[in-house]
């Protein structure tokens, strides 16, 4: 399995541009002698999903194993070659090591072992490697719109959870705000309408609207002003400004209702400041995720973890979004996140993964698929 991981880490799928078709082809070939159905779903521009299925004895209630094929860009600050896997002190270093080609290798290796065992599972086991998770989620959307979720009861996504049982994930809204005010001399700010001040003030109002309440696995919702631009000159009050906010929501939050409240707050601010105009647009919308407490697979994973490793499996939640939020727009199913990677190392220089954690994740996944 570690050899498989090494080979996948050496395939460049930085997004942009993605080029996931290369890795999808590799996985398709890896399963070529495996007794399973397999296909490639082309989504254009050198990008593709790869899907495989082990047919079960009974229809419905399929288990889907999911992982994304792309990685974020390498970035600077590396002490190793990010596109060449390097083993050191029991860890593998490369872009995608934690997020999430290690999880991809675990699910792929366990899937092929299960297919080659000749033991037919009770229900279908589906493997889905998706493109573009790190950007727009187009791969997951294409997979869902092709009807490939129609018989799926549970999706196990091999995102980095440090071997924890991921039962919840924050939702995400990227909100673009644009303000038009009135310029004037910087010495007489009272004569103008400061667009930058208006957007920073709105950001505070949004933060108050979003926050409040906590989740046992996720903590608090957050609203962070991450980008702002505006102004022409240091001695001129800016009449134009644009900002971006990263909003992370908790399970139970309806994004449509939340955006409606934010628009109302912006309208109230404009009413209180004649001449001010504010425009809002949603750039990314990923719903929060929470696994049902009585999920059969979640309960069985906990039991197997204790049996295999003689310790309880920790429950965890993730602040980042995944393809789970896309899938749940199309199917009412349970989503569990589990993988050997560490979320703290995702998207960082010198990203790495523990080889021991990969082997433990494989043992658990292998045991789970024997009972699927």
Indicate where each model-derived feature is located.
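Phosphate-handling active-site elements
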Residues: 88-90, 110-126, 151, 206-216, ...
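Acidic/histidine-rich catalytic neighborhood of metal-dependent amide-processing enzymes
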Residues: 100-174
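Acidic/His- and Gly-rich active-site-bordering loop/insert found
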Residues: 1-95, 116-121, 303, 332, ...
């Amino acid at each position: 399995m570690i050899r498989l991981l090494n080979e996948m880490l050496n395939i460049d799928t930085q997004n942009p541009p993605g080029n996931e078709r290369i890795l999808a082809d590799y996985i398709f070939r890896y399963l070529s002698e495996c007794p399973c159905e397999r296909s490639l779903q082309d989504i254009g521009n050198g990008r593709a999903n790869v899907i495989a299925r082990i047919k079960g004895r009974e229809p419905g209630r399929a288990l889907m194993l999911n992982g994304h094929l792309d990685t974020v860009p390498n970035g600077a600050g590396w002490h190793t070659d990010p596109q060449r896997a390097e083993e050191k002190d029991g860890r593998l270093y490369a872009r995608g090591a934690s997020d999430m080609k290690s999880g991809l290798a675990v699910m792929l290796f366990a899937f092929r072992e299960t297919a080659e065992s000749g033991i037919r599972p009770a229900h279908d086991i589906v493997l889905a490697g998706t493109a573009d998770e790190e950007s727009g989620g187009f791969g997951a959307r294409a997979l869902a719109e092709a009807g490939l979720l129609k018989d799926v009861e549970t999706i196990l996504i091999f995102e980095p959870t440090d071997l924890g049982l991921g039962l919840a994930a924050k939702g995400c809204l990227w909100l673009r705000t644009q303000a038009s005010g009135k310029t004037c001399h910087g010495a007489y700010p009272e004569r103008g309408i400061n667009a930058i001040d208006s957007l920073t003030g709105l950001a505070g109002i949004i933060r108050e609207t979003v926050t409040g309440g906590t989740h046992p696995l996720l903590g608090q919702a957050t609203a962070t002003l991450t980008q702002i631009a505006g102004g022409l000159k240091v001695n001129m009050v800016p009449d134009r400004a644009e900002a971006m906010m990263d909003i992370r929501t908790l399970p139970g939050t309806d994004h449509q209702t939340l955006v409606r409240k934010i628009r109302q707050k912006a309208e109230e601010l404009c009413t209180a400041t004649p001449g001010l105009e504010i425009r809002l647009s949603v750039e990314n919308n990923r719903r929060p995720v929470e696994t049902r407490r009585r999920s059969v697979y979640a309960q069985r994973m906990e039991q197997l973890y204790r049996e295999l490793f003689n310790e309880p499996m920790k429950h965890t939640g993730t602040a980042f979004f995944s393809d789970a939020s896309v899938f749940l727009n199309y199917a009412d199913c349970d989503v569990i996140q589990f993988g050997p990677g560490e979320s703290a190392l995702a998207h960082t220089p010198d990203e790495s993964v523990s080889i021991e954690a990969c082997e433990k994740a494989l043992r658990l996944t292998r045991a789970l698929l024997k009972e699927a």
